[in-house]
Amino acid sequence: MVQVSKVNCSGKVRKCRLHDLLREIILQKMKDLSFCHTLSKRESSFEGFTRHMSIDGVSYDVLKRFENTHIHSLLFFNLDELPKSFMSTLFANFKLLKVMDFEDTPLDHIPEDMCSFFYLRYLSLRNTKVKMLPKSIGKLQNLETLDLKQSLVSNIPIEINKLCKL
């Protein structure tokens, strides 16, 4: 069952959530079909094949062991830290990413070598501590969505004009 979790002052629904039992059923079905996998505090390792990964509140020790290069979507939730060394691993090992969502993570910079994500279509830096975008963002030729809401980015590099699909 879908439940309303937040309503604005005019009575419009702003956020919904799934009932816990339904959420667990959906997560198990996604895992069984190898469609998506959620790596959480309860599950500190993952072996197998999946194209979509959700990382929910795991420690850095888990993140640094994580090397599934076939992943196309990577979503982060409830992380206390996102070390620069993990970012280097991410940029080196996950070349097939199409979706990267850092919303609400403690991310404070985007490395210059971000241009290695040729297939990246969606990048969310919403509510992060990122202050500037690297000039290499102009090399993300397939980028269609760049979410900078509630981020600290105040200047956008001129190279962003090269992104025809944005």
Q: Which positions does each model-derived feature cover?
A:
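Surface-exposed helical/coil interface segments that assemble multiprotein signaling complexes
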Residues: 1-117, 122, 138, 158-165
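Leucine-rich repeat
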Residues: 108, 130-131, 153-154
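A detector of tandem-repeat and repeat-rich interaction/domain scaffolds
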Residues: 131, 137-146
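Acidic, glycine-rich calcium-binding repeat modules characteristic of RTX/beta-roll
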Residues: 143-157, 166
